[in-house]
């Protein structure tokens, strides 16, 4: 059985939306993209280096499309990103030119993936997918990088409940 590990940058008020850049995810008029940048330094780089070891990825479609448009051309910053298998949960997409991409349709496909053999599976971004995984008790570990900032609004890691 494989472990599913969620890696996420979050704020003190639980926002996980668009940590990397202003254009990353502007849905719902989110204007704080790139909020993690002021907190990156050599220590953070070393932590990320260890966490970005080669592991298969499980991504929601929206996050995949952001990754697909960026990482193939910037793979020096994430060694192995092009070689690992990228499992994408999508009801609309079926193909990608990005090597080693496999599309999954539903929860049953995710459960089969988890119950199979192979490396750990990392989830990055993918807020809606994370909610589905948490609701169905499929997350084995949460690796959260909590930053000392509050944004007041944005997509949250933990849904209200």
Name what the model sees in each region.
Residues 1-161:
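Enzymes that bind and transform nitrogen-containing heteroaromatic metabolites
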């Amino acid at each position: 059985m494989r472990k599913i590990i969620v890696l996420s940058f979050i704020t003190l008020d639980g926002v996980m939306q668009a940590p990397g850049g202003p254009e990353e995810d502007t849905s719902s008029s989110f204007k704080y993209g790139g909020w993690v940048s002021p907190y990156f330094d050599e220590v953070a780089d070393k932590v990320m280096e260890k966490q970005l070891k080669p592991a298969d990825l499980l991504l929601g479609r929206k996050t995949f499309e952001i990754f697909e448009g960026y990482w193939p051309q910037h793979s020096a910053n994430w060694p192995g990103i092009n070689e690992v298998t990228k499992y994408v949960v999508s009801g609309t997409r079926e193909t990608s030119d990005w090597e080693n991409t496999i599309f999954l349709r539903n929860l049953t496909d995710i459960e089969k993936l988890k119950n199979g053999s192979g490396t750990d599976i990392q989830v990055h971004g993918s807020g809606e997918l994370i909610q589905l995984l948490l609701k169905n008790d499929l997350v084995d570990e949460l690796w959260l990088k909590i930053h000392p900032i509050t944004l007041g609004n944005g997509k949250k890691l933990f849904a209200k409940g």
